[in-house]
A protein has these predicted regions:
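Active-site cleft segment of glycoside hydrolase catalytic domains centered on the general acid/base Glu
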Residues: 7-18, 27, 56-60
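Well-ordered alpha-helical scaffold segments within catalytic/enzyme domains
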Residues: 1-15, 72-90, 135-150, 228-241
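Long, well-ordered core segments of solenoidal/helical folds
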Residues: 20-43, 48-54, 95-113, 157-175
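Solvent-exposed loop and edge beta-strand segments that line ligand/cofactor-binding
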Residues: 54-75, 86, 90, 109, ...
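CBM-like carbohydrate-recognition segments
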Residues: 123, 129, 133, 138, ...
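Short helix-capping and hinge/turn segments at secondary-structure transitions, especially at repeat
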Residues: 78, 82-89, 99-114, 121, ...
Length: 242
């Protein structure tokens, strides 16, 4: 989104249009490289060389769909749409991609709670409902429908997610402040050996396995969840004011 905004603010129409084309290209390449036809979801990452220890040697994809990675992706698509001019001809390509991704997100929404599991393509008692990605998805569903890029059915899914967030993840503390619980603190992949990795800084624990994701700490009030929760709350406030 910053790349789009900077181009539109500082460059001529022709140069800004070329930068918007680059933004669309990058987003579509991410779809092409990380989409998994078997699950209908997007993998956490892709290695162009197919050589990293966490990557599938055939297609370069990591093993699983990490919910927050997909949350970052769909938020980026939507925020780029938000700043792209309506007469930009390739805007429709991103609208179609947003609809495709959010359809898959809704299909993987937990039926009981309305929120999402940390690793979206694994059904296991060890998996857990995770708040930061759930806030991201709720925000995109609510804002995307308000902006007309997603249908009203998606708004209903976003409202259900928001209620699930309030019920499952929001704790009222003794001093009457709020806490957002069940935040994945961090997850990543590697790095392994490489020309830009200092010797001794490799991290082979982060191998992209399900057990790896489950080994990362869970905390309260991670800013990567608080921000999207505030944004989703503002969307609900606008909806309720109608």
């Amino acid at each position: 989104p910053f790349y789009c905004n900077y181009a539109l603010t500082n460059y001529s129409d022709r140069k800004a249009r070329a930068i918007l084309d680059d933004v669309v290209h990058q987003i579509l390449q991410t779809d092409l490289r990380t989409y998994d036809k078997t699950t209908g979801l997007w993998k956490h990452a892709w290695d162009e060389t197919h050589s990293q220890f966490w990557a599938n040697q055939g297609n370069g994809q990591s093993r699983h769909t990490w919910a927050r990675a997909l949350g970052w992706y769909v938020m980026a698509i939507m925020e780029c749409l938000d700043v792209m001019p309506n007469d930009y001809p390739r805007k429709a390509e991103l609208v179609a991609l947003l609809q495709k991704t959010m359809q898959a997100v809704v299909q993987n929404q937990d039926k009981n709670s309305g929120v999402w599991y940390d690793v979206m393509d694994v059904k296991s008692p060890k998996n857990y409902l995770e708040s930061t990605a759930s806030c991201m998805f709720s925000y995109v569903l609510l804002k995307g429908s308000r902006q007309g890029w997603l249908s009203s059915d998606f708004r209903e899914a976003g409202k259900r997610a928001y209620q699930g967030i309030l019920q499952r993840f929001i704790r009222v503390n003794n001093d009457l402040t709020l806490s957002l619980t069940d935040c994945c603190s961090v997850s990543g992949l590697g790095p392994g050996k490489g020309p830009f990795v200092p010797k001794g800084k490799e991290n082979y624990r982060r191998d992209g396995s399900f057990d790896y994701y489950m080994s990362e700490p869970i905390r309260d009030n991670d800013p990567k969840g608080i921000g999207p929760f505030i944004w989703a709350s503002l969307e609900m406030e606008q909806y309720n004011a109608q």
